[in-house]
Amino acid sequence: MYNWCYYHSSERHKTQGGIHMTADKVRLFFAGKGLADRITVRNEVSDTAEHSAAVIGCDIGQIAKTLSFLQDGKVVIILMSGEAKVDNKKYQHQFGLKSKMVPFAQVEDATGYAPGAVSPYLLKEGTEVYLDVSLRRYQVLYTAAGSLNSTVRLTMDELLDCTGAKGFVDVCKNWQPAAKAAS
């Protein structure tokens, strides 16, 4: 069984039965929605979209990676397709300010999740969640489920419902078929 503490030495990271306690909270959240069977826990750690897609056996675009940004003192989460990159011009047009990611060392304090395992569920109060339009081309998506070795499989409607997303934004590049062919 994967031991989260083995890979991350901070004393703040506690395990219960070998699984990070935030993963247990996410599991309980989905159990309450009747979706607990959608969570998969693996022995292998998947901390990047590329690795997650390989482990799951899906298209990298189906991995809804979760990026954390700071906006005027609040945290904003944007879920985007696994191969997408943030386009700073689009981000500034959408939000009216430059993109500023939460520094790696502050991710857990800002989101409640460790870097690489940020889940878009049960976030700290006041956190806003948006989905990038790059996700719309898929019927089934995968997100982190609170640990580096767990994912949850959801439809787009389920993802919208479970995240409480404020809506869709268009802040990414390198995901459109034409853009991928040109790069």
Residue ranges and their predicted role:
Residues 2-8, 14-183:
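Extended, low-hydrophobicity, polar/charged segments
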